[in-house]
């Protein structure tokens, strides 16, 4: 009885247009790597950047208030530190 060939597995999600990430260690035998499309990668980066920007703005006064209580940990402007400390005392965060 003749032995059949072992064909490489095709990634069904890649064939349907889905994105597949590269396995850094020990990929499955016959696994295929499909690079993400450039437009999708740029879109993801933009979304992540916008989220980070929003979080930074939201937490700026809180971080400054904590820093003003822990003298010497961070260098911040006096006005921003006082505003943050005031909000901490009032319990806005």
Curated annotation (Swiss-Prot):
Biased composition (Basic residues): 19-31
A GO CC term assigned to this protein in UniProt: nucleolus
Protein name as annotated: UPF0390 protein C24B10.18
Organism per entry: Schizosaccharomyces pombe (strain 972 / ATCC 24843)
Pfam families linked to this entry: DUF2462
Sequence similarity: Belongs to the UPF0390 family.
Region (Disordered): 1-32
Signal peptide: none
